[in-house]
Amino acid sequence: MGSWYSGNAADDGANTRGWILGHFLDPSAGERSTKDLEVKWGIHPAGEQRAEWVTGDQRTTLVLLVQGHFHVKFHEGDATLTKQGDYLVWGPGTDHSWQAEDDSVIITVRWPSLPH
């Protein structure tokens, strides 16, 4: 593999829960194997949720709505993504949970890419 790659996010993320870049990819994945960031193509059917809170995560996160209606809960309040291009950013240590209100496609970017 050279210094560039072309693929399909749904296909490439099929065996990694949608994650297409990150430290967890084998180095044979070339440029997609990186400790700098993680990128996920998330397809979430209506009603899917992470009921348990994500706590203590030490990465910065960007969530970008491609389509759908997506709700994120924080201890300090809630945010809803409803319009294509709506996004949220939160810093390390921000606890959260989420729910797809409608069928939703989300791009998630986290940095740096850290083992759990």
Task: Give residue ranges: language-model regions.
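A generic "binding-loop/recognition-motif" signal
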Residues: 58, 78, 94, 102-103
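Short acidic-glycine-tyrosine-enriched beta hairpin
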Residues: 76-93
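A short hydrophobic beta-strand segment most commonly corresponding to one strand
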Residues: 41-42, 87-89, 102-116
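A short, N-terminal "cap"/entry segment at the start of jelly-roll beta-barrel domains
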Residues: 1-46, 51-53
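Short, conserved beta-strand element in jelly-roll/cupin
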Residues: 44, 55-72
